[in-house]
Amino acid sequence: MVVVMKPGTRQQDIDALVSRLKELDLDVGITNGVGCTILGLVGDTTAVDMDKISINPHVERVMRVQEPYKKANRKFHPEDTVVSVGNAKIGGGNFSVIAGPCSVESEAQICAVAEDVKASGAALLRGGAFKPRTSPYSFQGMGTAGLDLLMEARKQTGLPIVTEIMDPRMAELFEREVDVVQVGARNMQNFELLKEVGKMSKPILLKRGLSNTYEEWIMSAEYIMAEGNENVILCERGVRTFESFTRNTLDISAVPAIRQMSHLPIVIDPSHAAGMYWMVEPLAL
């Protein structure tokens, strides 16, 4: 349920209504937009009498939200969320590039790539220290040693680092050392992991699963936000289709669709979608 306050409503009147709503065992999210304040009500609203809220002299209108996602819903938060990482801003019309190797393989490799990334104008450095692989015999990443190398590259370049978490038990380490925590496509519906990263203070980059719908994707973001972390960045990285020319098919339509459905920022990963270097630039453009 969404409650839109009348323009110019005093803060004390907003606080009074919020207090009454919380007495109904509802979680009340407050969004101060341009010209008005919006209250997003999360919880069991089925027994809430909309008319009793509507008659409040400071309420403009009351709307029920049919979608299962609430905190991530554009109706709850009409303005774009902007996530700040170092000097970079993601969302709200800001342009930022995240670049780096798929996996960290050596100090020389990651530091050289980091310097190139910085020189090219990218704002964040990504690199995999822990790698989810289809085959158990494939390289699984350097683990904590790779994370140490990412931290060294950050020290040399000043670029914030983005890397993937796979195990909820690593949350404390990532909270301490990583600037943006990535949840990969294979873990998009690992709900225990989502709950754990939701307790973190660091921004979360949530990749879309191989065959997940927009609603399922946003619901995964909702898991994170329900735990208190609202700094979620959605990442479209390609979906599985019948086409075999590319590794995956980049779903360009996800960008305008998500922007209409949610206030969360969305970025695309053309590298993992295409799997071919020469397609990265045209897909990104």
Name each region found by the language model.
Residues 126-144:
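Glycine-rich, proline-tolerant flexible connector loops at the mouths of alpha/beta enzymes
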Residues 1-97:
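Non-catalytic terminal accessory/regulatory regions of metabolic enzymes
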Residues 8, 95-112, 135-140, 160-164, ...:
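Active-site mouth loops of central-metabolism enzymes
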Residues 85, 200-285:
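Catalytic alpha/beta core domains of metabolic enzymes, predominantly
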